[in-house]
Regions:
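Intrinsically disordered, low-complexity terminal tails and inter-domain linkers enriched
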Residues: 70-118, 286-289, 300, 305-314
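Short, acidic/small-residue loops that bind anionic groups at enzyme active sites
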Residues: 170-187
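Short phosphate-binding loop-to-helix
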Residues: 112-115, 119-142
């Protein structure tokens, strides 16, 4: 079943991360773009999936990149002609554009008689604010994708799992939808809109949970579930929405008016249709390739603070 937005089929990006896998991940035939974040390229390759693009600092990948096309510009290893301007490290290159990342229309069949383009890769520095996963999502967004199916984004390192939850909230705020696939469960985030689930044989205790990702989420509706609510307000300090249940052969709808909510549901559930009132942002921001400007510089900042007259104690204040 295809994911739809207001009756349309939006451009879908499938991302392979370097987190935990559970044995049932596979290629999405309807994905317009497939991107691997660093070591996710190994997981994709082990399942016979060829990404359009591999991005990251390459601290976890083992896949041979000799056949990949290097987009360059960020790793310090790539060179450019003497006297030529250095590549813009923050913007996706023209090679990352939608026209350069074409996918088969279905597995085993391409959209043209030509062979698929070789996998491209873009190396990023290790010291940067964005995770490799967020870089992959940003590039997918630049390629026109608004729905993201992410493998390897749950489990493994807890800090990365938490970062990925923040990331799918970012996508929701920008007018898109990203889903993290786990062990029999999918986690997604939505804002100012709703998810609609078709009737299905849910069986007993087919759990669906709703939690606020923002400080406050308002106008929450849960219809067609065991516990139904209308116009509820949740905060991110409440756990009220945990462990609701699908009802067998009953359509369900989950939505909200303001804020962002997380929704978790079984991967056996039908793919929900999705509506949002948010006009998609043109960008999720430039690729981050440098350490945060907020970082202190050990030693130097301390000296500057001690010698700065504006920070010296006022005479007689002690």
């Amino acid at each position: 079943m295809k994911e739809t937005v207001e009756g349309t089929s939006p451009r879908i990006c499938q991302i392979w991360g370097a987190g935990q896998y559970y044995g049932h991940e596979e290629a999405s035939p309807d994905a317009a773009v497939i991107i691997a974040a660093d070591g996710g390229a190994d997981e994709a390759a082990s399942r016979g999936v060829t990404p359009d693009l591999v991005v990251g600092d390459f601290d976890s990948i083992t896949t041979d990149r000799s056949a990949f096309v290097d987009l360059g510009g960020n790793d310090g290893d790539s060179t450019h002609s003497p006297g030529a301007p250095a590549p813009d490290e923050s913007r996706p290159s023209s090679a990352d554009s939608p026209s350069s990342m074409r996918r088969p229309s279905s597995q085993g069949a391409t959209t043209s008689p030509e062979s698929p383009s070789p996998t491209k890769y873009r190396r990023l520095p290790a010291e940067k604010d964005d995770t490799d996963m967020l870089a992959a999502v940003k590039l997918g967004w630049e390629a026109g994708c608004r729905i993201f199916r992410i493998y390897g984004g749950l489990g493994g390192r807890m800090d990365h799992t938490l970062a990925n939850l923040n990331m799918i909230s970012l996508v929701a705020a920008a007018g898109g939808r990203a889903s993290l696939y786990g062990d029999g469960i999918i986690v997604t985030a939505i804002s100012r809109g709703f998810l609609s689930f078709a009737p299905w044989r849910s069986g007993e205790r087919a759990m669906v949970s709703v939690l606020s990702a923002t400080d406050r989420s308002e106008g929450i509706n849960e219809r067609g579930l065991k516990y139904q609510v209308e116009g509820m307000t949740m905060t991110n300090l409440e756990l009220t929405g945990v462990s609701n249940e699908f009802l067998p052969n009953t359509p369900a709808r989950i939505g909200l008016d303001r804020g962002i909510i997380y929704v978790t549901y079984p991967d056996a559930a039908p793919m929900p249709s999705w509506h949002t009132d948010i006009t998609p942002a043109t960008s999720l921001g430039h690729l981050d390739t440098r350490p945060s400007r907020w970082l202190t510089r050990p030693g130097r900042d301390q000296v500057e603070e001690e010698t700065d007259p504006t920070t010296s104690p006022v005479q007689g204040s002690e």
